[in-house]
A protein has these predicted regions:
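Extended, compositionally biased non-globular segments
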Residues: 10-133, 137
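Single conserved hydrophobic/aromatic residue that forms the stacking wall/gate
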Residues: 1-12
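Exposed low-complexity, polar/acidic, P/S/T/G-rich flexible segments that act as propeptides
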Residues: 139-155
């Protein structure tokens, strides 16, 4: 049944012709929501612009929901939209990163210019304004309907 399949190319079998035409109008070849979603964050939970002069915690109660064969990543970009140079050459955190889950299965990522003293997983941000892009390929249906990315809390 092509309405539930998630294989590569299945988007062309779906019946959402109007939606697919609108996507093609803006960016031919762009992924539809069934294939990928791209949440972006520019502000913390206090509605302040993200700035590497501060330290933040990105807390996932549960890992981003993707289907088998899918993956997720979070990448930090400077306000110039380029990757941020850093001493450990780490530019993103993904489902394939070597992070350590909390006892309850949640994940905490420290966003800051300097390595955290508590040993938590660190995504370097530089010491200027930055933003985050999350990519979820083959997101689980609940991601499309109910899941909200976590807020970013200043420490």
């Amino acid at each position: 049944d092509s309405s539930t399949s998630r294989g590569l190319g299945d988007v062309y079998k779906r019946q959402a012709y109007d939606y697919r035409a609108a996507v093609a109008l803006v960016g031919l070849g762009a992924n539809t929501n069934e294939i990928a979603i791209y949440p972006r964050a520019d502000y913390d939970s206090n509605n302040e612009v993200l700035n590497g002069a501060n330290s933040y915690t990105l807390h996932f109660s549960s890992l981003p929901p993707v289907e088998e064969g899918g993956f997720w990543s979070i990448t930090a970009y400077g306000d110039d939209n380029y990757l941020i140079d850093n001493p450990i050459n780490r530019y993103n955190v993904t489902d394939r990163s070597e992070y350590k889950l909390n006892v309850d299965g949640s994940l905490d990522v420290t966003l800051s210019a300097n390595a955290p003293q508590d040993g938590s997983y660190w995504l370097p941000t530089g010491n200027k304004a930055f933003h985050l892009f999350m990519r979820m390929y083959l997101p689980d249906l609940k991601a499309l309907d109910n899941w909200t990315p976590p807020t970013i809390t200043k420490k």
